Amino acid sequence: MKRIFTALICLGSLCSCVDYLDVVPDNIATLDIAFNNRSSAERYLTFGIAYGLQNILTPLNNYWDGEERGMPLFQAIRDCNIFIEYVSDRNRVAGLYETERRRWLAEAKVLKAFFHYYLFQLYGPIPIIDKSLPIDASVEEVRVSRNKVDDVVDYIVRTIDECYTDLPKVIQMEAVELGRLTQAAALAIKAKTLVLAASPLFNGNTDYANFLDHDHKPFISQEQSTEKWERAAEACRDAIRSAVDDGKHDLYDFSLDATYPMPDELLYGMNTRQAVTERFNKELIWSVGTQSTFDLQINVMPLITPGTNNINASNANSYCKANYAPTLAVAERFYSSNGV
């Protein structure tokens, strides 16, 4: 009997199912899951804000495609476009109030405008990415062309103008919403864009007369325009008015916090210094708070490359960035009395 039972087990082990196992695991990350409720959709939005945590202290940072310690801002723009597409559908994101929907869409649109502005200030004429391309897009669809500077600027301004009024004037719950956009922040981005566009770099700069597109037309306008300065000035007035009228912003004044009288020179220096270093002072319009000192440490440490010491190069290069480190040329401008 035991032999018969053993033989049956052996025969059973030689058999198998005709079809492959066709079971899809639960909770696979998809866009539909990302936007099926309010909480996950809001997390998607905050990822867009996180792309702004970057610096321009070194030209090695590549924001075009995210290399050399830069952030891939075209990927950030795609994330914004996906968010706008899904949240605009009122059949998605269960539990989302209409006022929240309008605010979130405005935030995503202004973030998209900001990322276009950031790329514009680094690279000049850039392609305008207003919609996310499908995964199966053809090569011709993916090969987008750079747009002229004036078109890029108009797109950024138009995107902000159509939605900034849906943003709050001030952040009421700073403990959970610090870093979220306000009307003043959106108008400040618009103003910075128009000031840059009116500057001599992009306003009639004949040094770029030979910088042409495929139609042999200049990417940068070759005619100076006073209207661009007027438009920029008006945008600056709007941004200042919005920041001051909300009651939370003003020019920083150190004298209001000074306990004892101070010489004018020292007071001037403290005003200049503290306006930059004092956390969340009144001049700060848009910021993301952090308590970590690790970022400061990795940015001031020398960039370690293979062969310089015995530290593991793969780990060192991922942490030591030297973004805040002066170059040798700068150091040599400040010799001591002993020559070093």
Task: Please provide the spans of the model-predicted regions.
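C-terminal motif of bacterial Sec signal peptides marking the signal peptidase cleavage site
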Residues: 13-16
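Short amphipathic alpha-helices and their capping/turn segments at secondary-structure boundaries
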Residues: 178-186
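Short edge-strand/loop segments of extracellular domains
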Residues: 132-137
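Contiguous, well-ordered alpha-helical segments that form the cores/surfaces of helical PPI scaffolds
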Residues: 107, 114, 188, 192-195
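Sec-dependent signal peptide recognition
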Residues: 2-7
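An aromatic- and glycine-enriched ligand-binding surface/loop that stacks and positions planar moieties
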Residues: 18-60, 126, 130, 183-184, ...
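Conserved, well-structured interaction surfaces
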Residues: 39-124, 139-178
